[in-house]
Amino acid sequence: DDLKVLIMDEPTSSLSQQEVKVLFKIMRELTAAGISIVYISHRLEEIMEIGDHVTILRDGKYVADADVKDIDVPWIVHQMTGGAKSYPKRDREVDWSKVENVLEVKDLCLPKAGGGYLVDHLNFELKKGEVLGIYGLMGAGRSEVFECLMGLHPEHTGQIIMEGTELHIKSISQQIDSGFALIPEDRQMQGLVQTLDIEKNCALSALKRYKKGPFLDSKKEAEKVDQEIKDIQIKVADKKLPILSLSGGNQQKVVIGKGILTEPKILLMDEPSRGIDIGAKTEVFDIINKYAEEGLSIIVISSELQEIVSIADRVIVLSNGIKTGEFFGNEIQQDTLVLASYKGHHIEEKES
């Protein structure tokens, strides 16, 4: 009865569309009862749907505010980025048929409890320096592919061949040694140790590389971390500060830097721009582009259509664990990806 102001911070980040509708209905009931709501979100379409008034912050500072009825999404984007570029479509003049494979996945299957497959006889390859996108709806099996590649599911079947040699995967540490690095979907739970500072988080996966006999070479560790902070432009006042002192975008850069410091041949990125603002997304895309140009092979999972269209050289689409489409270059269009993402559902419906 005493509630006057309700603050909601990214309340829809893990909700389905139907659940979002329920939340918005409750919010409208609360505002009708006289309760004020501060709604923090990077999902601009939600701001336009549920908001009455919007305030834009950039780098912790006030930029602008307006009534929602007087503005549109491009106005918000302009205020958030300060007129910075929207990320252009990736367009490289590369004859991929002449580029060697770094990774080949053949007939990959991951059994599902109760029968069927989470990943169903999947085949794909990855070229040196290529950005391969994996698109699909929730439950498509995308993250499970990464989990198989990183050794989390030793029960998987099929062949995983890296630079011509078949891998017999047993553990995550083995896969890191083999040249894989994973940027997980949930950076807070899986990508960061919240009790450690920025430097220790950045160095964590590459500690083997800083061994000096039975000890760690702290000087070498610090030099490598400093260089990575500079290379991917992590905005940090002091690397000894707690990791949670950073913005979401800079925390994500630390997770990416941690992976890069293991000197991988293949970088797996699961929803790398989730929960960060538009400006930080552009910076993450720049990082992807930079390392791909240097020859790093990258696989990106994304639920954001515009994002995957922009950054990928090639996209495979999964639905219910089945590969339902593969698109190259200018074939990568939002409508074709969406259509392919529904094919597996239709297959399952016909079989059941």
Region spans (language model):
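Glycine-rich phosphate-binding loops of nucleotide-dependent enzymes
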Residues: D1-S352
